[in-house]
Regions:
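Beta-strand-rich domains and repeat architectures in extracellular enzymes and scaffolds
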Residues: 34-64
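Beta-rich catalytic cores
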Residues: 41, 61, 105, 128, ...
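Residue-level detector of Asp-centered blade-edge/turn motifs that repeat once per structural unit
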Residues: 48-51, 112-117, 165-168
């Protein structure tokens, strides 16, 4: 079921990046293909386990994380929002200078489930800074919400691409390109 949902979601969001059709422009189904309206430049997806929710990163100039409801294919901005309340974990992310809401520009994302069952989202961020931003996901409301808890700044001349959480709290990230655009 999860694999089917992931494949459907990947296919659906990839359709948004191809040449638009009349059905896609109106966000109506085109035969068996369903479209998701709203996310701009979707780059990566993460399924929120045991829920109808997907998180999509939108790598545009300002950039957002989007929450997609797989039941009706609707979407909404998840982060950054003016109402966001950060909770900086300075023990785990002491080298992080704090939240920066401007020019978010998210790229690769990875969602993990902790030993306590809580979800954590790791987000490669370009824009105002090159970093991996870390969020706790709150599933207690009608829709999930994010709380920013910290970041890991990229070393000089490193441009992250994808990120994955490792056992015992570590993370690994790929280096996409040099700041001048060379690979």
């Amino acid at each position: 079921m999860r694999l089917r949902l992931l494949l459907l979601s990947c296919f659906t969001l990839s359709c948004l990046m191809t040449a638009p059709s009349t059905a896609a422009a109106a966000c109506e189904a085109d035969g068996a293909v369903q479209f998701v309206c709203g996310p701009v430049s979707p780059e990566d997806l993460a399924i929120v386990p045991e829920s109808p929710w997907l998180i999509a990163s939108g790598m545009e100039d300002d950039g957002y994380l989007y929450l997609v409801d797989t039941r009706d294919y609707s979407s909404a901005v998840l982060y950054p929002l003016p109402s966001a309340q950060p909770r900086h974990d300075t023990v785990s992310y002491g080298d992080c200078p704090g939240p920066n809401m401007s020019a978010f520009r998210p790229h690769g994302i990875n969602l993990t489930t902790g030993a306590d069952g809580a979800y954590r989202l790791y987000v490669v961020r370009h824009g105002a800074r090159e970093s991996i931003e870390v969020f706790d996901i709150d599933m207690t409301g009608a829709t999930p919400s994010l709380t920013w808890i910290g970041c890991v700044l990229a070393p000089e001349a490193v441009v992250f691409n994808s990120v994955v959480a490792l056992p015992e709290g570590g993370i690994a990230a790929t280096h996409f390109q040099m700041p001048d655009g060379s690979v």
